[in-house]
Design a protein with these regions (language model features):
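Non-catalytic terminal extensions of PLP-dependent enzymes
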Residues: 2-131
């Protein structure tokens, strides 16, 4: 993927994770969030976004050790396909519409953070527990 996506610390040996930044998306109109949301439509849970904070537009990928080489290769192919699509330069709107195939589309993350709607009901205590 190093020929399509940008590695902020160069191509060094890594153990179990890989970190990309968003410079490969420069001038495409596609944001880190847009790219991650498009992953959902491809059947993958998005990678960790915007962390670590010292990397602009960070995309942190940590596959589990139980994934087969074939599964990792397929994941890489999806990432490569999305990166190529973003670099076409005329696909920003396609990315901004993602995810398309989920029960809920894009949520208003700002409103959710500022005005959370949380539900929790304590379990009723039995009489024995009160004694």
């Amino acid at each position: 993927l190093e020929d399509l996506m940008s590695l902020p610390f160069g191509s060094r040996w890594c153990m179990h994770e890989v970190l990309f930044d968003d410079s490969f998306l420069k001038d495409t109109g596609v944001s880190t969030l847009d790219f991650a949301k498009a992953m959902i439509d491809e059947g993958y849970h998005p990678m960790t976004m915007y962390f670590p904070l010292v990397v602009h537009g960070a995309l942190l990928i940590e596959p589990t050790e139980t994934e087969s080489k074939e599964a990792i290769d397929q994941f890489i192919a999806v990432l490569a396909g999305l990166a190529k699509k973003a670099k076409q330069g005329d696909q920003a709107e396609w990315f901004k519409q993602a995810p398309r195939f989920t029960p809920r589309r894009r949520l208003d993350e700002t409103a959710a953070a500022r005005k959370p709607v949380l539900r929790w009901k304590p379990e009723e205590q039995s009489k024995d527990a009160a004694d």
